[in-house]
Design a protein with these regions (language model features):
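Short hydrophobic transmembrane-like helices used for membrane targeting/insertion
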Residues: 248, 257, 278, 298, ...
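Conserved NTP-donor binding/palm subdomain of two-metal-ion nucleotidyltransferases/polymerases, i.e.
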Residues: 1-122, 127-250, 308, 313, ...
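Intrinsically disordered, low-complexity regions enriched in glycine and serine
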Residues: 272-277, 323
Length: 445
């Protein structure tokens, strides 16, 4: 890792609040370089929140750069307000047409951030109930020429904001694991479509439960790694998913917790979010209850074993209330369920790599990791993140150009690089791509 990348990571920990002290390495920061990395990784707003917490003597950047950073942060704030409104309006439009929906990632993820308006927004990913045939048919009755792929169909933009209509939240390239993933989504979909929250003071939407997000967003990151590349923004999202998981179970076991403005269903106003002294909102959504439940026993080498010890020690040392003990048991049971799903889906080693990044890069305490960290896989994934940037747009290893042929050659080259670590996905990728070609022919308008 290069020197400025290391300084960037140190400062990122401070920005997200996993460390409280200003990193000493910041004295050697090249702020122009940090800004370039933040742009590459779509973390401009997150870092600017950290800059606002710094004493003036620690901000050694030129005034022009500071003003540019401030302007971009304000643009992100405005964009999030527009995205909030669009997510609400699009959800309501589908509801009136007879479809239940759930907003994936995006503005639902922003609810977990200390300052929801600092997250770099993208498009609207909306999961629409009904299955591929029904949803594709409905969308094309509105806009006949929209293109469909295996998990979503394009949709007319709403006030300039791109919309993707999902009939499957995500997918895996390995046919066997993907079959299990789609069964999981079918099994838990009811909780997702009925899990409604307030999006600031603008309106109400459905977002996934936190336990669902632990699995879904991991598959989303995995898919990006296999197909185009991932950035730190997706990993910061997952950091807050993990934080959110523990907040939910603590609040669920504590009925005295307020469900109003203190919860993650409340967006602070954009003006209040600019103070730089924001507190992470706590979610108060009821955790998902899997129909199948989790394993009744976890082996000693499983993360859940150490986690229960850590949670139990923490509980006995810091609290004597029944609610704290209940929170520990509830979160441990939920982790058992998540671990069982990750093993079934072939995601155990990848999850271990992500946990290594959560601990080493973001400063996540070991007691909050959902599987044991895997250094070998973590270092590989982290290198991919730093090389490729958000959506792989900055990957200098793309040597085949931007044509369709170049894209396919790049995919083969990527598969070769990934097969050592993720053989099932990498070896199935060419097969899936061939199968997907005929799937798209079937659903071509």
């Amino acid at each position: 890792m290069l020197k400025q990348q290391k300084i960037f990571i140190d400062f990122l920990r401070f920005c997200i609040g996993s460390v409280k002290e200003i990193p000493g390495s910041l004295k050697e920061a090249d702020w122009q370089e940090l800004y370039a990395i933040a742009k590459k990784q779509c973390l401009v707003g997150i870092l600017f929140d950290g800059i606002k917490k710094l004493p003036a003597e620690h901000v050694g950047m030129k005034k022009e750069l500071l003003l540019q950073w401030m302007a971009e942060s304000q643009m992100l704030e405005n964009a999030n307000v527009r995205l909030n409104d669009a997510a609400i309006q699009v959800s309501e439009w589908f509801r009136k047409k007879g479809f239940r929906t759930c907003i994936l990632k995006g503005q639902g993820n922003a609810l977990m951030y200390p300052n929801p308006y600092s997250r770099t927004p993208g498009d609207i990913d909306i999961w629409v109930e009904g299955g591929d045939k029904r949803v594709i048919s409905f969308v094309r009755s509105i806009s006949p020429h929209e293109k469909a792929c295996y998990h979503h169909i394009e949709f007319p933009s709403y006030k300039g904001i791109e919309v993707e209509v999902h009939y499957r939240p995500s997918f895996l390239l390995c046919f066997w694991h993907n079959r299990k993933l789609q069964k999981y989504y079918e099994r838990v979909k009811e909780e997702q479509f009925s899990h409604r929250v307030m999006l600031g003071e603008q309106g109400e939407i459905a977002i996934p439960t936190v336990e669902f997000n632990l699995i879904f967003q991991l598959t989303h990151i995995y898919s990006h790694l296999m197909n185009e590349g991932i950035g730190l923004r997706q990993l910061v999202d997952y950091y807050y998913v993990l934080c959110d998981f523990y907040k939910v179970y603590q609040n669920f076991s504590n009925p005295s917790v307020s469900l109003s403005k203190g919860s993650s269903t409340f967006f602070p106003s954009p003006s209040s979010s600019g103070s730089g002294d924001v507190t992470a909102p706590s979610r108060c959504s009821e955790p998902l209850r899997s129909k199948d439940g989790g394993p009744s026993k976890v082996s000693p080498n499983c993360a859940g074993w150490d986690r229960r010890d850590a949670i139990g020690d923490m509980t006995s040392a810091t609290a004597s209330t029944d609610s704290s003990a209940t929170a520990a048991r509830s979160s441990s049971t939920a982790i058992d369920r998540v671990q069982e799903e990750l093993k079934e889906l072939g995601l155990w080693k990848f999850a271990g790599g992500i946990m290594y990044i959560m601990q080493e890069v973001f400063g996540m305490p070991a007691s909050r990791l959902i599987v044991p960290p895997n250094e070998k896989y973590g270092r590989f994934v982290l290198n991919e993140v730093l090389e490729a940037g958000n959506f792989g747009r900055h990957d200098a290893r793309n040597r085949f150009g931007r044509s369709q042929l170049g894209h396919n050659l790049q995919r083969v080259y990527r598969d070769i690089r990934l097969v050592k670590f993720f053989p099932a996905e990498a070896l199935c990728e060419p097969l899936f791509r061939t199968w997907h070609f005929f799937w798209r022919l079937k659903y071509r308008k």
